Amino acid sequence: MNFDVVIIGGGLAGLTCGIALQEQGKRCAIVNNGQAAMDFSTGSIDLLGRLPNGENVQKVDRALAGLSEQLPAHPYAKLGAERVLAKAKQFEGMAAKLNLGLAGSVEQNHARVTPLGGLRRTWLSPDSVPTVRPNEAFPYNNIVILGIEGYHDFQPQLLADNLKLQPQFAHCEIKPGFLTIPELDFLRRQSREFRSVHIAQTLEQKVNPASLINEIRQAASGADVVFLPACFGQNSQAFFNELQAATDFMLFELPTLPPSLLGGRQHNILRQYFERLGGVMMNGDRALRAEFEGNRVVKLFTRIHEDEPLAADNYVLASGSFFSNGLVAEFERIYEPVFGADIVQTERFDPSDHFTWTTRRFSAPQPYQSAGVVINTDCRVQKCGRFFDNLYAAGAVIGGFNGIELGCGSGVAVVTALTVADEIAEKSGG
């Protein structure tokens, strides 16, 4: 099977790259092994929240120079500040066109409310999630936080207690409460099934919206704004928007323990748009190995296509990190399993020395979290010290940074994905 581009990985990086290439007339296939990290995410997209020295970032454009000095191996440092900001703005345009429902701007980070009542800096958040700008108070006074009776993945009292400690919410009266929703009783009897996905399915299929709206109104009497767990609308925000339109107060939703409906909604929209553009999703397939000629990849063998390998002019490795088996750790080494790409090595981290992978303090950032493949300024992948001509990397499979520590994981995904799409299009005259 022949394509212009074969992409390994159907997460945020893979789909963003695939959409950008399909829009430029390329014929793309995505080899997708299963659920992506997006399905477990909060739905917010971080560009850069913190520098390696611990300094918090409000304006990303002012922080990129410091990032390059402190961490020259970071993908942003390799791409350059101008390109990073341009690709971030390009993704904002893509998100608006696809109606991903994201709010925020590359001009300045905002803070989103976390499920535990904290505030976390981020770049883009679902517009249904409560957020505050730096040094500004939350614009409402009376907040009611409503959980669902028997649903333990969202704790209104804990959220309320912690939120009261935040200066931006010091002026607010915050009350916790619960919704009963009798139609969920059959799920309550099966605690393993009482999760956000199953709740959302039941609410959309079996619950009378009028009775649900009435219960929310009664439980939130006197409130200016109501916080709900993100269980109202599985594949889109439409059901949540219907509830919002029928009530007299503002509704916001907060992500729950995984699986996350907020990230899953975005994943569905991206995947469906990629397929509408003519892209091919090879779901349930897994890349196994590749065949090379010099510095070029010529064939990709997958679990389903072992006898008839995939062939393409260019290949994109967007397989993610350890979570999705884009990287594999054994006792003596960390490696990339499909192409055998070189793994980033730093002063603190050696992929072949197990004792450098962790630090003594469990809660501290761990060196192994910065593991990933080596790329150049074009996002081409290195193997045995030489860069491939037609193999690129995007997203968490790239090494040299800790996305959790720096608050940049999803930003790296979209910035590198759009960079790769540009490189491939320019090379082939697209």
UniProtKB/Swiss-Prot annotation:
Q: Which SUPFAM superfamilies match?
A: FAD/NAD(P)-binding domain (SSF51905)
Pfam short name (any one): FAD_binding_2
Q: What biological-process terms (Gene Ontology) are attached?
A: glycerol catabolic process
Which pathway does this polypeptide act in?
Polyol metabolism; glycerol degradation via glycerol kinase pathway; glycerone phosphate from sn-glycerol 3-phosphate (anaerobic route): step 1/1
Gene Ontology molecular functions: glycerol-3-phosphate dehydrogenase (quinone) activity
Keyword Repressor listed? The answer is no
InterPro entries, A to Z = FAD-dep_OxRdtase_2_FAD-bd, FAD-oxidoreductase_2, FAD/NAD-bd_sf, G3P_DH_GlpB_su
Q: Which key words tag this protein in UniProt?
A: Flavoprotein, FMN, Oxidoreductase
Reactions performed catalytically: a quinone + sn-glycerol 3-phosphate = dihydroxyacetone phosphate + a quinol
Enzyme class comes to oxidoreductase
Co-factor(s): FMN
Q: Which GO terms describe its cellular component?
A: glycerol-3-phosphate dehydrogenase (FAD) complex
Enzyme nomenclature, EC number? 1.1.5.3
What does the subunit section of this Swiss-Prot or TrEMBL entry state? Composed of a catalytic GlpA/B dimer and of membrane bound GlpC.
Role this protein plays: Conversion of glycerol 3-phosphate to dihydroxyacetone. Uses fumarate or nitrate as electron acceptor.
Against NCBIfam families, the record matches this protein to: glycerol3P_GlpB, PRK05329.1-1, PRK05329.1-2, PRK05329.1-3, PRK05329.1-4
The family line of this record is: Belongs to the anaerobic G-3-P dehydrogenase subunit B family.
What is the name attached to this protein's record? Anaerobic glycerol-3-phosphate dehydrogenase subunit B
Its organism's taxonomic lineage begins at: Bacteria, Pseudomonadati, Pseudomonadota, Gammaproteobacteria, Pasteurellales
**Gene name per UniProt:** glpB
